Amino acid sequence: MEIGQQVKVCRLRDRVSPLIIKRLGKVGTVKGFKMLDGSNVGIIVQFEDQFATWFFEDELKVM
């Protein structure tokens, strides 16, 4: 995945807040990356309403 790409949230791996659950099935734009634990990288996604959060790569699908 690259910065600027459109992605769709296709699954949620962990229990998350209702605010994140509302993003399931939504499309957003990759804004950056976040180092998680030394071996995993999170993808920072921003949505139309300017809300941004990170997801695991396997939770997203490139559009």
Placement of each model-derived feature along the sequence:
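Basic/aromatic-rich interaction segments and small domains that mediate binding to polyanionic partners
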Residues: E2-M63
